[in-house]
Regions:
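Domain-level signal for soluble alpha/beta catalytic cores
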Residues: 1-117
Length: 117
C-alpha cells in the first residue's frame, strides 16, 4: 500500500508549500533519501525528513539519527533540513519509548549541527 517516493516526488515538488514532511527512517523508506539527488528542492523550501521511526520500538542511536540528517543535508543543503519523526509516535508506541526516540532525535540533531556548521 506504500508507494515509492520516486513515484510521487514530481507531485510533491509541484505543491506550493514551505516544506515537505515525509517518512525516511522506516525500513521501507530509509533508502529514499537518494531521490533528492535527482530532484532540486524548490527555492525557499525545507524538508522535514523522518529520522526516527514510528514503526519499531527500537530507539535509534543518536549517531544513526545524525547520520540520517547529514545524508539529507549533503544533498539539499544543511539550511534546508529540519529533522522530524516518521508520522506521529503516540498512537503506536509506549510513551516512554516515544520520549526516548525524541531524546535521541535531539541528541542526533546536536551531533549533526556540530558537524555541519
Amino acid at each position: 500500500t506504500d508507494v515509492p517516493f520516486a513515484d510521487i516526488i514530481e507531485e510533491f515538488l509541484r505543491a506550493e508549500v514551505g516544506g515537505f514532511s515525509f517518512e525516511a527512517a522506516s525500513p521501507r523508506h530509509a533508502h529514499e533519501w537518494r531521490v533528492w539527488q535527482d530532484h532540486a528542492l524548490p527555492e525557499g523550501t525545507v524538508i522535514y525528513p523522518g529520522v526516527v521511526s514510528h514503526s519499531t520500538n527500537a530507539v535509534e542511536h543518536p549517531r544513526l539519527v545524525a547520520d540520517r540528517i547529514i545524508q539529507f543535508a549533503e544533498v539539499v543543503g544543511p539550511e534546508n533540513v529540519i529533522a522530524s519523526t516518521d508520522c506521529g509516535l503516540g498512537g503506536r508506541l509506549h510513551p516512554q519509548i516515544a520520549w526516548a526516540k525524541l531524546q535521541s532525535l535531539v541528541e542526533g540533531a546536536d551531533i549533526a549541527t556540530r558537524e555541519l556548521f
